[in-house]
Amino acid sequence: MHNIQLVQEIERHETPLNIRPTSPYTLNPPVERDGFSWPSVGTRQRAEETEEEEKERIQRISGAIKTILTELGEDVNREGLLDTPQRYAKAMLYFTKGYQTNIMDDVIKNAVFEEDHDEMVIVRDIEIYSLCEHHLVPFFGKVHIGYIPNKKVIGLSKLARLAEMYARRLQVQERLTKQIAMALSDILKPLGVAVVMEASHMCMVSRGIQKTGSSTVTSCMLGGFRAHKTREEFLTLLGRRSI
C-alpha cells in the first residue's frame, strides 16, 4: 500500500529532473556504465594503461612538479625535496584513483539483491575526501545516501564505495552529489534516491575569504524524494529540518 501511494504521489508531482526531455541530464547523461562522467581522452587512457605506462606517467608528473617547485623559488636538490616530486605524483594518482574504477566491475560487482523491502534505506555519515577542480585543494565531509527500493536492494557497503569512487576525482561538490544519486538510480531503478552532502572546502578556509567555520551543503533528490512529504521524512531521519 505504501508503494502504491508513493507512485501516485510521484505521478502527481513534477517530473523528476533526470527524465525531463529537455534536461541536460537527459541530453548528456552524467553517469555512464563504467562510472565516468563526460570523460576526457586522458581518463580513458589512464583506466586502460599498463603497469609500464603508469610508471611513465609517474615520471612525467614528477618532472612537472620539479618545474613547479623550481618556479616557486625552491631548490629541488635539497634533502627535504629530493623525493617530493615522486611522492607527490603517487599521491595525486591515489587522490584521483576514481578515474581507474569501473562502477560495475570494481564497485557494485554482484551486490544487488532481490528483496521486497518497501521503506527507506539510509546510510548516514559516509566520510568523503576529494579535490576541488578549481584550485586542486581538498574538500572533505560527510555524505548521506537514501533510497526507496523497487524490488531490489544493494549491499550497504557499496553505497560508501560508490561515494568513494566519485570523490576520488577532480570534483565540484554539486556534481559529486548528483553523480552519486544518479548512479544509484541507474543501478537499482528505485522509487527514489536522495543524497545530501556536507563538506568543508580548503579553498575557502586556507585562501581567499578564509572562513574557517563555513561548510557547504548540497542535495540531489530523484523520484519520490522530490515530493515534499518524502523529502521531509528523509531529512527528519537525518536529524535535519531542512537543507
From Swiss-Prot:
Phosphothreonine modification, residue list: 15
GO BP term, example: tetrahydrobiopterin biosynthetic process
Positions of modified residues (Phosphoserine): 23
CDD domains linked to this entry: GTP_cyclohydro1
Catalytic activity: GTP + H2O = 7,8-dihydroneopterin 3'-triphosphate + formate + H(+)
Cross-referenced PROSITE patterns: GTP_CYCLOHYDROL_1_1, GTP_CYCLOHYDROL_1_2
Domain of life: Eukaryota
Family matches, as SUPFAM superfamilies: Tetrahydrobiopterin biosynthesis enzymes-like (SSF55620)
Primary enzyme class: hydrolase
Gene Ontology MF terms: GTP binding; GTP cyclohydrolase I activity; zinc ion binding
Disruption phenotype: Leads to folinic acid auxotrophy, and lacks any detectable specific enzymatic activity.
InterPro entries tied to this protein: GTP-CH-I_C/QueF, GTP-CH-I_N, GTP_CycHdrlase_I, GTP_CycHdrlase_I_CS, GTP_CycHdrlase_I_dom
Pfam families, alphabetized: GTP_cyclohydroI (PF01227)
GO cellular component, one term: nucleus
Keywords of this entry: Allosteric enzyme, Folate biosynthesis, GTP-binding, Hydrolase, Metal-binding, Nucleotide-binding, Phosphoprotein, Zinc
Binding site for Zn(2+): 132, 135, 203
Similarity-based family: Belongs to the GTP cyclohydrolase I family.
Function according to Swiss-Prot or TrEMBL: GTP cyclohydrolase 1 is the first enzyme in the biosynthetic pathway leading to folic acid.
Note: Present with 2840 molecules/cell in log phase SD medium.
Protein name: GTP cyclohydrolase 1
Native organism: Saccharomyces cerevisiae (strain ATCC 204508 / S288c) (Baker's yeast)
Gene designation: FOL2
